[in-house]
């Protein structure tokens, strides 16, 4: 469950939790990462709403897949002049901005799977992983997780 504030990962069998973990890397952290990246690389201050819009419009869990996506025009305040400024940002840059968060989520999934018994791990291979929450809508996240976990 990739929510706003936390990502909760669990292996569930027969209605009970076999192994789980919760990390404070989720949708809000993705937004913060975008804000920081734009500030650092473009000298542009953007707000949370703009970061969330970028996340929904062009963000991808994969830098490679993001190369195929369109760029986005955003507005903010130029940190050098203090004046309003409009820039074009590539989807690839947004994907780069959020890679640390994506990798933390993948690490949590892998660690949870590593704590799972062989029988339940076999069930996970057969039935797959279920992604829920708003953060699960991040483009290419299922493919990136499948590649990292081989599930």
Briefly describe each language-model feature range:
Residues 97-124:
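Phosphate/ATP-binding catalytic cores across multiple sugar-kinase/actin-like superfamilies
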Residues 6-11, 45, 73, 130:
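Structured core elements
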Residues 1-17, 66, 139:
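Gly/Thr-rich phosphate-binding beta-strand-loop-beta motif of the actin/hexokinase/Hsp70
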Residues 1, 34, 109, 131:
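Residue-level signature of catalytic and energy-coupling elements of molecular machines
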């Amino acid at each position: 469950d990739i929510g706003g504030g936390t990502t909760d990962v669990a292996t569930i069998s027969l209605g009970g939790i076999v192994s789980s973990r919760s990390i404070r890397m989720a949708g809000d952290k993705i937004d913060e990462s975008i804000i920081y990246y734009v500030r650092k690389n473009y000298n542009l201050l953007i707000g949370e709403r703009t970061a969330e819009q970028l996340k929904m419009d062009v963000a991808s869990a994969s830098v490679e897949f993001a190369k195929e996506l369109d760029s986005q025009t955003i507005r903010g305040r130029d940190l050098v002049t203090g004046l309003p400024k409009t820039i074009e940002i590539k989807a690839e840059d947004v994907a780069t901005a959020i890679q640390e968060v994506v990798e933390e989520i993948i690490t949590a999934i892998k660690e949870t799977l590593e704590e799972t018994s062989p029988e339940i791990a076999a069930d996970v291979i057969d039935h797959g992983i279920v992604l829920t929450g708003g953060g699960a809508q991040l483009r290419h996240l299922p493919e990136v997780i499948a590649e990292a976990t081989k599930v």
